[in-house]
Amino acid sequence: MFAPVYFDHNATTPLDPRVLEGMLPYLSVQYGNASSRHEYGRAARRAIDEARQRVAFAVGAHPTEVVFTSGGSEANNLFIKGAAACLAPGTVAISAIEHPCVREPAKALQRAGWRLREIAVDENCRVVGADFKSAIDEKPALVSVMLANNETGAVQDVVALADHAKPLRAWFHTDAVQAFGKRRLDFRALNVAGVHAMTLSAHKLGGPKGAGALVVDKRVELQPLIAGGGHERGLRSGTENVAAIVGFGLAAELATEQLDARARQLEALRAELETGLVAQGARIFGGAAERLPNTSCFAFADIDGETLVGKLDRAGFAVAAGAACSSANQEPSHVLLAMGVEARFARGAVRVSLGNDNTAAQVRDFLGALNTTISQLKGLAALTS
């Protein structure tokens, strides 16, 4: 069977074979419930404890700060809704480029009587310092600014932002789902600066889908979204998905190995990609910002992104139009619109997100296929205009 070249690693990553191998016993012979008080249960509990230690070590946190969830979306909801439930309604401040699993719970708070304050970003997808300071002057009780954007790859200076917000004593959260595995994370340093919670997900770094974590300062009071047996420090009830959690721990450990060298390789591949894109007339979004090393978001004027992605798929290349989590939405990306990108470009946005197994030859082949496809689409447009 023909396998397209996979250039969509910000959507999900292939399961690392070493991770799968570590998970298999917990999908077969080690089937105990971690709450059971016999050896099967104790074995499951030991596996979860070891995975928790691995995740904590990978991000510079204490194991007791790691709360396992079903993924990044649940972890983001747990922080925003869970923290808000323990506070009187006030202001929640989020950046204008947050993932929907931050934006939507924030909007839910707005419907429940909270004030929602969106913080502006500039043309390179970076939080505007003056508007952030203005938002902080409004004394929000909750603040959430993502560490790295899933569409453009733009990285925020979360340490500086949290440090500025620190005197306010608001709970500060960062969604690090895209950053984890692509750059080094140090929750202890973030916490000292004023970050109280950080979201992670396993499937973005060679782990399984269905496992994530909220790394959270124990001073933060949260009301659980799921009530029940009091698992995960009472913050996330439900029988643990032992196999997925084990896989998460292994993926987290593996992601930190040779991270800097892998990042340099990905940056070099992206540089070759973007040189070719610019030569073909593409506009790169967020190119002047510090970005994740693997991510490039671009568009051609008046070329529909969904159409381009479909043709590239048929040519053997798997890329994304905007973000995979909202691909059913045909509206222009809220991220690009927040950056001030005109609709004629925003509707054409395509994201290439490279992975460790991608090669320079694949990038060159992609550029060739893209050039052919763009020529065809422009020719068709000329005939129908």
Which residues make up each language-model segment?
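Pyridoxal 5′-phosphate
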Residues: 1-385
